Amino acid sequence: MVQLRKLLRVLTLMKFPCCVLEVLLCALAAAARGQEMYAPHSIRIEGDVTLGGLFPVHAKGPSGVPCGDIKRENGIHRLEAMLYALDQINSDPNLLPNVTLGARILDTCSRDTYALEQSLTFVQALIQKDTSDVRCTNGEPPVFVKPEKVVGVIGASGSSVSIMVANILRLFQIPQISYASTAPGLSDDRRYDFFSRVVPPDSFQAQAMVDIVKALGWNYVSTLASEGSYGEKGVESFTRISKEAGGLCIAQSVRIPQERKDRTIDFDRIIKQLLDTPNSRAVVIFANDEDIKQILAAAKRADQVGHFLWVGSDSWGSKINPLHQHEDIAEGAITIQPKRATVEGFDAYFTSRTLENNRRNVWFAEYWEENFNCKLTIGGSKKEDTDRKCTGQERIGKDSNYEQEGKVQFVIDAVYAMAHALHHMNKDLCADYRGVCPEMEQAGGKKLLKYIRNVNFNGSAGTPVMFNKNGDAPGRYDIFQYQTTNTSNPGYRLIGQWTDELQLNIEDMQWGKGVREIPPSVCTLPCKPGQRKKTQKGTPCCWTCEPCDGYQYQFDEMTCQHCPYDQRPNENRTGCQDIPIIKLEWHSPWAVIPVFLAMLGIIATIFVMATFIRYNDTPIVRASGRELSYVLLTGIFLCYIITFLMIAKPDVAVCSFRRVFLGLGMCISYAALLTKTNRIYRIFEQGKKSVTAPRLISPTSQLAITSSLISVQLLGVFIWFGVDPPNIIIDYDEHKTMNPEQARGVLKCDITDLQIICSLGYSILLMVTCTVYAIKTRGVPENFNEAKPIGFTMYTTCIVWLAFIPIFFGTAQSAEKLYIQTTTLTISMNLSASVALGMLYMPKVYIIIFHPELNVQKRKRSFKAVVTAATMSSRLSHKPSDRPNGEAKTELCENVDPNNCIPPVRKSVQKSVTWYTIPPTV
């Protein structure tokens, strides 16, 4: 027997010419007849046309035994479904009238090689036998009983069994319609051209399972397959489709061996292997009932209740038997099953079956014992685990649990598909003939196959039954989840369906302990917003999360990109947002102090100017040089005004005024002071040499010189306007800190630090020159035209600006650059103006207002007096020890009359000096 099985397996795999195979099969058929003593059971129903049936009535037996325990659901339910369908068809006057369908139903014992041996029964009638040499003992030729001719086969169940049988049936052109085989390989019309099925292939099922896994957010799963065509091809399809879809990785693929010595140890080892990838909690299963039951038991022994997330194929479907005593480990399992409906007529039929009315089913007594857990008194009972006697009065559904097996509908549809094909064939070939005509008997399987592929009728579920060119049914699946908690009716719950696309009701799903949140099955948890994935080589579903830093944002899952120049990342770094625009506000502490000082200075300047205008003809005002005083006060006023321009909101007009007035106020002030100190210096220097008055010392000349100095500043500003017109910009570099949250865009005029210094540079040059003259005239008697106050003013101003430069440039890289530089510049200009105003004009205003008695005209001096004073000053400066109790008190008349100048008296200077009165010149 073992050798026969091996030979059968080789024959189905090797390609022999049909004639050779037929000769070999003749011998095999004879051998098979001899095996009927070994497995004599089969169901025979007489009819005009006989259909074959292959069902897994029993499970696989242990080593050396072909058949094991009876399969109540997958075996008996399905077998009875065929008998029920035959009864319905034979009683239907509109389907195959005057033709009775018979059957020859065999047990495959869930084993492909055993099924192949059994299927040889179907081809016996087609094998021609040479009996010329055969004689009976009396010398007469024997009379052979011709076996029934099987025109088509319903089955088998397992894909590996169907493949093995299909290889034989195609040689004899016997059409085959399977009710459960879903292996993708059976869609190959070149190898399995006589094979059809009323269930969709696993390629559709695998696509549906991939869609389910992705819909649940799982990207890292393991696969588990029973050894054989169904399991291995199913996993192969799932793996291929998942790779094509992308975003789904297979942690490991585990195969359950068909032949195993110790089942418990093997399944415990499989569970341990699955736990090697703990993050891969989802397990996609393409396995038979027994393997499913064993794997659940092993998971329970490993105390992994709630860890694994099972995704079962249609071999699991909505079956109860594999879950018996393992309901807790199966909690939350998602299963798929070809779309079906409960056939109510079958329920009534099956629950009415008894030992008395179902004698045609040779395995029904064995089913009765297993179903009711009792022992029949008839001989041949196989029930050894109980002493309870069966009464025969038990009833299915009352004394035992009953639920219609998931493939019953498809068994019925397969029988009806064969019947419809025979019906159309009978109408075409036997139009005027009652029953099966000779043409139909001789038509052959190829013609019947053509009719099978063209059937189209509403099946038992109300859905169309049809086949494509490969013999496959369209893909329609129901999706279930096994739920036991928080439900009044524990069991499978319909949660969706798949017909070319997935429809999944996630809100109806629940997991262990009634949890509604979908548990993860990912290699790495999703990255947080603002992080990118860095995949690991070889495992695209495993990654490390790297945060986008600096001014980067998360462009997509894998990439961080820099924000545009004027933007920064948002709070969670999933996009960019505009950088806030800032300017120096009036209410800012950085602006309040300069504005306050400027307002005080403006008020003081206006007060001084008003006082001078009011007392314009008084001696003090006249002696201070009225023309240059008003020019100087104007410059001081502009120095205060620039504070408001520097703080005002930048626009083109404001920026234009900034350029003009930034250095103009200082330029006017220091141009006037320089003219004054230069005049004093020239007068005293000229007095040392001769009594001739120097040139350009009149008020008009002084104004002309001052205007010339100021015009240089204005010329530079106009050139600046021409080369670089005023404009406003938003400077993002100035406040682009390391922390993007602190980044700011500064709205400002298009003026660089260098341009500011250049604009002030000319004024600083005037200031330095004026300081030099102040130093040179430091020896002039203090009453001679403010030489000493001007000197103190310039010294103080230099100190202010020496402090300004390092602060201004030292904060160029500071985040507070806008505030510090603006405040420093405005305060420096305010201080410079205040120093000049305070030292040069406040004493005069004090005398004018509070001591008018001192505001009287003093003696006017001619240039001769100036010369004498200059000579005196020179000598006193060389002989400080000769000064009597301090410096000589002298006064330089503001309006020296050159016509009254007399040559200087060259004589020794006594301790007392006699001054000559010179008539005043107005």
From Swiss-Prot:
Residues 616-627, 676-702, 776-788, 851-922 are cytoplasmic. The chain crosses the membrane at residues 591-615, 628-648, 655-675, 703-723, 754-775, 789-810, 826-850. The gene is GRM7. One of its GO terms (biological process) is adenylate cyclase-inhibiting G protein-coupled glutamate receptor signaling pathway. Belongs to the G-protein coupled receptor 3 family. It is a multi-pass membrane protein. Keywords: Cell membrane, Disulfide bond, G-protein coupled receptor, Glycoprotein, Membrane, Receptor, Sensory transduction, Signal, Transducer, Transmembrane, Transmembrane helix. This is Metabotropic glutamate receptor 7. L-glutamate binds at S159, A180, S181, T182, Y230, D314, K407. Its main location: membrane. The keyword Lyase does not apply. Homodimer. Interacts with PICK1. GO terms for cellular component: plasma membrane. GO terms for molecular function: glutamate receptor activity; group III metabotropic glutamate receptor activity; protein dimerization activity. Residues 1-34 form the signal peptide. Pfam families: 7tm_3, ANF_receptor, NCD3G. G-protein coupled receptor activated by glutamate that regulates axon outgrowth through the MAPK-cAMP-PKA signaling pathway during neuronal development. Ligand binding causes a conformation change that triggers signaling via guanine nucleotide-binding proteins (G proteins) and modulates the activity of downstream effectors, such as adenylate cyclase that it inhibits. Glycans are attached at N98, N458, N486, N572. Residues 35-590, 649-654, 724-753, 811-825 are extracellular. Disulfide bonds join C67-C109, C249-C541, C374-C390, C430-C437, C523-C542, C527-C545, C548-C560, C563-C576. The lineage of its organism: Eukaryota, Metazoa, Chordata, Craniata, Vertebrata. It is found in: Cell membrane.
